Every structure is written in structure tokens, then in C-alpha cells.
Regions:
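Glycine- and small/polar-enriched repetitive beta-structure motifs of secreted/surface proteins
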Residues: 1-255
Length: 255
């Protein structure tokens, strides 16, 4: 008794079954696209195996081969790109609100919610992590359990990786900003290569191209301006409390 359904391709929507009159507005295009949907509505699934495990899930968009291919009961997801959100799987009805656009973007997400990934391999290792934004190729690409990170730019926070659930509150915006950060938290790094050598360092602010670009383990530094504190480098964990504001400000400071 389902109405307003479009199914194109081998096995597309072949298990959909409404026993009462229902306007489904489901669209499935591709071999086995939406093949397991039973009573879900308002889904748009385009591509081979797109959303093929979804059952009673609603308001999903999956475009691309094996996009959103594992999930059964997750709703309100947008997966555009080959294998985008390919392993997301909610075993209970959940509004995930995950958005992944790009080849394998958010590919490893299982039960994380409210993440936004735009770019090839963006956030592709995250599993049960929430409230992240990764925009740019390989942005936030290594992390598994870090939450509340913002990485915008090619390779931003590329090596950040928390293996236990952690709210990182890291913000990195710019080409390879915070590129080497592993387990540092609460860093704000804005500008091309800003803080790009920092690893397990915390509470830093680097704003400007190449600001704080050499330091690995210094914490609590503020560098604002192009190349500010760009020679500072502490190889052991150190609270520096250095502040440099201006073009090349403190550029000769090392330790």
C-alpha cells in the first residue's frame, strides 16, 4: 500500500512493504539500493548498494556506491560519495544528523552523531565520536574517538588521534594547521601551517601563517601574527606562557 515510491535497478526497495496506505516518497536508484527498507520513508538512495541495509529509517540521503551501506535504523544522515558513512550503524532508532560529502568521508563512523565531514577521507577513521567538523581532504583523518574538534583545510589536524573518548576542543583552520597534533587539547590554530609541529601540547593560540610553526611540546603560548613565535620549540612538555603579537613577533625565541 505504499505510494509515491521510485525504485530503479535490480532489487531496489524490494522489501519495502506498507500495510496501510502511506506516501513513502522513497527513491532508490541502483542495484540493491535500499534493498532492506521495509517501512522507512523519505529516503533518497542513489548508487549500487546505497543504503542497502536500512530498514525502518527515515529522511536519509545516500548518493554513491556503498554510501550508508551498513546502517539499519539511523535516520537523518547525508552521505554523498563512494563509501561515505559506509560503516555507520545504529541498532536502535537514532537521528544521527551526520553529514559526509566526499569519497570515504566519515567512512569508519559507527555510532557517532552530529558530525560534518566534507572532503575526500575527511574524518574517515572516526568511530564513536560526536560533534566534529572536518572540511578538506584528509582533515581529521586519523582520529578515532576525539569529539568536538574543528578542522578546516587540507590536512588540518590530520594526525590527531584520541584512542579513548575525549572532548578535544581543538580548532585548526588553514592548510595543514595543527597537522602534527596527536593528543593535545584546547588549541586554536588559524592560518596556513599554524602550529603544524605541535603534538601533545595544550592551550595554545596561533593565528597567522606559520605562527608557532616549529614547537612540538610547548603549551600555553599565544602567537598572533605571521611567523610569530615560529622558532619556539620545546622538546619536553613545558608551559611557556609566551605571548607574541605582531608580524614576526618573538620569531627568534627558541626556549
Amino acid at each position: 500500500l505504499g505510494s509515491h515510491t521510485t525504485a530503479i535497478g535490480y532489487g531496489a526497495l524490494n522489501t519495502q512493504n506498507f500495510t496501510t496506505a502511506t506516501d513513502t516518497y522513497n527513491t532508490a536508484v541502483g542495484s540493491l539500493a535500499g534493498a532492506s527498507v521495509t517501512t522507512g520513508i523519505l529516503n533518497t538512495l542513489i548508487g549500487g548498494l546505497a543504503g542497502d541495509a536500512l530498514t525502518d529509517a527515515d529522511h536519509n540521503v545516500a548518493i554513491g556506491y556503498q554510501s550508508l551501506t551498513t546502517d539499519t535504523l539511523g535516520s537523518r544522515a547525508i552521505a554523498i560519495g563512494r563509501e561515505a558513512l559506509g560503516t555507520q550503524n545504529f541498532a536502535t532508532a537514532t537521528n544521527g544528523y551526520n553529514v559526509a560529502v566526499g569519497m570515504q568521508a566519515g567512512k569508519a563512523v559507527t555510532t557517532g552523531v552530529q558530525n560534518t565531514f566534507v572532503g575526500a577521507l575527511a574524518g574517515d577513521a572516526l568511530t564513536d565520536a560526536d560533534f566534529n567538523v572536518a572540511i578538506g581532504m584528509q582533515a581529521l583523518t586519523a582520529d578515532t574517538l576525539g569529539s568536538r574538534s574543528i578542522a578546516i583545510g587540507h590536512g588540518a589536524l590530520e594526525t590527531q588521534n584520541f584512542t579513548t573518548a575525549t572532548d578535544s576542543y581543538n580548532v585548526a583552520m588553514g592548510f595543514k594547521a595543527g597537522n602534527a597534533v596527536t593528543t593535545g587539547v584546547e588549541n586554536t590554530l588559524i592560518g596556513g601551517l599554524a602550529g603544524d609541529a605541535l603534538t601533545d601540547a595544550d592551550y595554545n593560540v596561533a593565528i597567522g601563517s606559520e605562527a608557532l610553526s616549529s614547537d612540538t611540546l610547548g603549551s600555553r603560548s599565544t602567537a598572533i601574527g605571521r611567523a610569530a613565535l615560529n622558532s619556539q620549540n620545546f622538546t619536553t612538555a613545558t608551559n611557556t606562557h609566551n605571548t607574541a603579537v605582531g608580524f614576526n613577533a618573538g620569531s627568534n625565541v627558541t626556549t
